[in-house]
């Protein structure tokens, strides 16, 4: 519960900080080659739609883990979160998110990040996208130290509903198995 309150406090502080920004150029203090990153993140935060995330499935690669290990893992990674997202002038998707879910050992795992997807329209209502997410998470088995990462990301968009997936790579060394998980989540744009 303390971690959940901490995550919510951080989200509220970020929101208050963004709302308090009164300069016409919030990225003016950024290094020149990073300004486009700042500007896109600021645009996503300021102009994006509110999103609600739902997670619920984490598939552990059967080619890496033994049946005994798989039986001990939690594959119902229930959780949720909030975010902001938009489709840019080229039709590509940008999202900011803060989520929390139950990890493979049924421990609370928070994550905050940015995701980008290059999209292709199948028809008026259906889009598919491939891209990446840059995030920070923390895990009990790593002493809750913030861990930065980057992961591949894929999604199908249908009107306001999105189904997304990422693959968390890992090690398959005997006795040191970790990662190698397909993580699925859904999103509703509010």
UniProtKB/Swiss-Prot annotation:
Residues 1-18 form the signal peptide. The keyword Transferase applies. Keywords: Acyltransferase, Cell outer membrane, Membrane, Signal, Transferase. InterPro entries: LipidA_acyl_PagP, OMP/PagP_b-brl. The keyword GTP-binding does not apply. GO terms for biological process: lipid A biosynthetic process. One of its GO terms (cellular component) is cell outer membrane. GO terms for molecular function: acyltransferase activity. The active site is at residues 60, 103-104. Its EC number is 2.3.1.251. Its main location: membrane. The record marks 69 as: Role in lipopolysaccharide recognition. It catalyses: a lipid A + a 1,2-diacyl-sn-glycero-3-phosphocholine = a hepta-acyl lipid A + a 2-acyl-sn-glycero-3-phosphocholine; a lipid IVA + a 1,2-diacyl-sn-glycero-3-phosphocholine = a lipid IVB + a 2-acyl-sn-glycero-3-phosphocholine; a lipid IIA + a 1,2-diacyl-sn-glycero-3-phosphocholine = a lipid IIB + a 2-acyl-sn-glycero-3-phosphocholine. It comes from the Bacteria. It is found in: Cell outer membrane. Coiled coil: none annotated. Homodimer. Transfers a fatty acid residue from the sn-1 position of a phospholipid to the N-linked hydroxyfatty acid chain on the proximal unit of lipid A or its precursors. Belongs to the lipid A palmitoyltransferase family. This is Lipid A acyltransferase PagP. It comes from Legionella pneumophila (strain Corby). The gene is pagP.
